[in-house]
Amino acid sequence: ALADGQQNDAVLVPHSDAAYAVEHSAGDLSQGSKIHSLHNFITAPKPFRDLLLAQREPLADSNVKDDDMTARALSSKDYFLLVGPPGTGKTSRALRSLVEGELAAGCETSLLLMSYTNRAVDEICSMLKDAAIDYLRIGSPYRCDPRFQDRLFANAIGDDATLTSMKQLLAGTRVIVGTTTTISSHEELFSLKRFSLAIIDEASQIPEPDIVGL
């Protein structure tokens, strides 16, 4: 496989007269993340499972009567759905407003921003860059727009990073970005950092098993 090529060409010598075929190799990261996410869901506390199975209403702060979308979303205790046609500013304006509002709520707040595709995550990174909001992106450099590769975690920590410096970098960065598949496959992130708010952009396009355990 090109992703993890055979390093010892001597393996092929006994079969040098054979014919070979090149085929697509489907990685198991996405499938494994789905299974892991489902496991997290079925082992989660019953109130959480009841919420996602529509067995109870999502909770919100009853004191908030504001018609402002940001105030209503940030007052939600379980989840808040923002629905709108493409091109109506859900990422460029609404998401930015939510991020800025949560960060302004206190220095102890931190956010996890996700989407299904790397292209959509690029859009989130573009919004954060325009808003001058510091962030780290978890993911592969091969699937990240060159404009944002300096904010990839692997690049930000440098070549001489230690476990302590990596923990400090995560602790000191209030916004973490990645695809749902990548974040699901890096569960150690949740043992190193606690998030006050998670936002999934374009969530309606994502199969439930990809996000039900996040």
Question: For each predicted feature, which ranges?
Answer:
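Pre-ATPase regulatory/linker segments immediately N-terminal to the P-loop/RecA-like helicase/translocase core
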Residues: A1-S75, S126-D130, I138, D145-N155
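Conserved P-loop NTPase motor core of helicases/translocases
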Residues: D9-H15, L53-R56, A104-A198
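Acidic, Ser/Thr-rich intrinsically disordered and amphipathic helical segments
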Residues: D68-M69, L81, R93, A120-E123, ...
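Pre-Walker A (Motif I) flank of P-loop NTPase domains
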Residues: S76-L82, E108-T109
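Residues at the beta-strand->loop junction immediately N-terminal to the Walker
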Residues: V83-G84, M114
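Walker A (P-loop) phosphate-binding loop of P-loop NTPases
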Residues: G87
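Motif I (Walker A/P-loop) of helicase-class P-loop NTPases
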Residues: T91-E100, P209
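SF2 helicase catalytic motif II
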Residues: L192-I211
